[in-house]
């Protein structure tokens, strides 16, 4: 009888350990605009340093083209290029319905037409019966393919540090209690400060240090809650940032064309979408082609390497500025920063959206947890690769995507190594129990 009970107990312990591995949770952070070199000074960033020492850091993360936010939000969570998932810009226009997508702020931006081009990870998880909590994540408030996450703290402009730390605490509690299988937190301040003051400004350095303090708190909370062996933490950004000399490097379209011949213009900056009147198309194309510091593409001429031209909402003419240059209709229509006490100054000193291979557009990727190697430096990866990493940590089969497993496999602990470590810990637990230590 005693031997039978021992066998049953042994089986129970081993099953418990297997269940523990199966119940590993995932916490992801989308840090908007966090350039690849923002954490180069790890000596003075102890929060980031601990994650790097305990986990994986890639050399850099190449965004999808255009190196803008919404296209890359979706590439990160679908593993697909923009022309595949159809989220091709922060500002889009549908010629059939005349609807506009305006960086997610207007009611029409929640229409399924913009989002249903591909299935993001959180939708797949919900379909599989898993639970997802999301905090300020753009798109979590949208019904995509008929599905919404279990919980969504809707996006607000530039969430505060308190919003961030509160979200961390709430997310960890939801994951530990199994209310959530994955939690995602979006943080915008790095992007906002980079735009306003530039990527090398004192303001961006302060924002980075503030974020580092939040990650120090996160690391401490994970230890206090005894979650180091049960949670994978992944941090990534959507793009980088480059210095912008406001008003000095401006391409004014009305110097080359009559804007009344344009049916629709969407966005300004590094990438501008134009829909000229049909009878003026060739004239406008030829005139814009004479402009310096800018490439003009008919839709079918857009370089294949951009993985962009087959997008449903791509315009008939796409303008792409050289790095550091800014395309607009006219200087006079640009806003200025003015606090009422000083001379009006440049509205923005940093920008992104340029050719995705431009070095300043590179983003960041860090990860730590039981499924990742420790103190490991990996080579460059691409935005579309991140999805496969997330699926791997969740034990899910990824949907067809454009990512490369070969670029990210090196950062993962092998299944055998993970299983071996788990088995050793479980056997040790069993030994302690049998000897009466616990």
Curated annotation (Swiss-Prot):
Binding site for Zn(2+) 1: 32, 69, 238-239
Annotated Gene Ontology cellular component terms: plasma membrane; side of membrane
Signal sequence region: 1-22
Free-text remark on how the cofactor is bound: Binds 2 Zn(2+) ions per subunit.
Cellular localisation: Cell membrane
Reactions catalysed: sn-glycerol 3-phosphocholine + H2O = phosphocholine + glycerol + H(+); a 1-acyl-sn-glycero-3-phosphocholine + H2O = a 1-acyl-sn-glycerol + phosphocholine + H(+); a 1-O-alkyl-sn-glycero-3-phosphocholine + H2O = a 1-O-alkyl-sn-glycerol + phosphocholine + H(+); 1-dodecanoyl-sn-glycero-3-phosphocholine + H2O = 1-dodecanoyl-sn-glycerol + phosphocholine + H(+)
Binding site for substrate: 32, 69, 90, 191, 239, 352
Lipidation sites (GPI-anchor amidated serine): 415
Gene Ontology BP term (one): lipid metabolic process
Family statement drawn from the similarity comment of this UniProt entry: Belongs to the nucleotide pyrophosphatase/phosphodiesterase family.
Purpose of the protein: Choline-specific glycerophosphodiesterase that hydrolyzes glycerophosphocholine (GPC) and lysophosphatidylcholine (LPC) and contributes to supplying choline to the cells. Has a preference for LPC with short (12:0 and 14:0) or polyunsaturated (18:2 and 20:4) fatty acids. In vitro, hydrolyzes only choline-containing lysophospholipids, such as sphingosylphosphorylcholine (SPC), platelet-activating factor (PAF) and lysoPAF, but not other lysophospholipids.
Protein's recorded name: Glycerophosphocholine cholinephosphodiesterase ENPP6
Taxonomic source organism: Danio rerio (Zebrafish)
């Amino acid at each position: 009888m005693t031997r039978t009970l021992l066998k049953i107990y042994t089986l129970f312990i081993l099953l418990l350990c297997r269940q523990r591995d199966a119940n590993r949770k995932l916490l992801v952070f989308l840090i908007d605009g966090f350039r690849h070199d923002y954490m180069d000074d790890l000596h003075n960033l102890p929060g980031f340093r601990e994650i790097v020492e305990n986990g994986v850091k890639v050399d850099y993360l190449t965004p999808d083209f255009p190196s803008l936010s919404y296209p890359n939000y979706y590439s990160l969570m679908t593993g697909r290029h923009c022309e595949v998932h159809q989220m091709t810009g922060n500002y889009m226009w549908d010629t059939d319905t005349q609807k506009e997508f305006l960086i997610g702020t207007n009611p029409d931006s929640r229409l399924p037409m913009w989002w249903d081009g591909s299935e993001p990870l959180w939708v797949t998880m919900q379909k599989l019966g898993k639970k997802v909590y999301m905090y300020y994540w753009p798109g979590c408030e949208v019904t995509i393919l008929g599905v919404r996450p279990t919980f969504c703290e809707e996006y607000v402009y530039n969430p505060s540090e308190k919003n961030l730390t509160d979200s961390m605490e709430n997310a960890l509690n939801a994951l530990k209690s199994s209310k959530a299988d994955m939690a995602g937190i979006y943080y915008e301040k790095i992007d906002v400060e980079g735009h306003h003051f530039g990527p090398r400004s004192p303001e961006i350095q302060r924002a980075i240090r503030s974020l580092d303090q939040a990650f120090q708190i996160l690391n401490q909370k994970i230890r206090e809650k005894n979650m180091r062996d049960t949670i994978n933490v992944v941090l990534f950004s959507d793009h980088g940032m480059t210095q912008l000399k406001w008003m000095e490097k401006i391409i004014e379209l009305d110097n080359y064309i009559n804007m009344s011949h344009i049916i629709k213009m969407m966005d300004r900056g590094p990438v501008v979408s134009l829909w000229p009147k049909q009878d003026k198309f060739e004239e406008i194309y030829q005139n814009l082609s004479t402009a310096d510091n800018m490439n003009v593409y008919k839709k079918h001429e857009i370089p294949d390497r951009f993985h962009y031209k087959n997008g449903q909402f791509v315009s008939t003419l796409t303008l792409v500025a050289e790095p550091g240059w800014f395309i607009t209709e006219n200087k006079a229509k640009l806003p200025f920063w003015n606090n009422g006490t000083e001379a009006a100054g440049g509205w923005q000193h940093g920008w992104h959206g340029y050719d995705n291979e431009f070095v300043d557009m590179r983003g960041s990727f860090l990860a730590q947890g039981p499924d990742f190697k420790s103190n490991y430096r990996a080579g460059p990866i691409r935005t579309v690769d991140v999805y496969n990493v997330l699926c791997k940590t969740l034990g899910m089969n990824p949907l067809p995507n454009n990512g490369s497993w070969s670029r990210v496999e090196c950062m993962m602990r092998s299944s055998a190594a993970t299983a071996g470590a788990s088995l050793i810990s479980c056997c040790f637990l069993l030994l302690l129990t049998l000897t009466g230590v616990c």
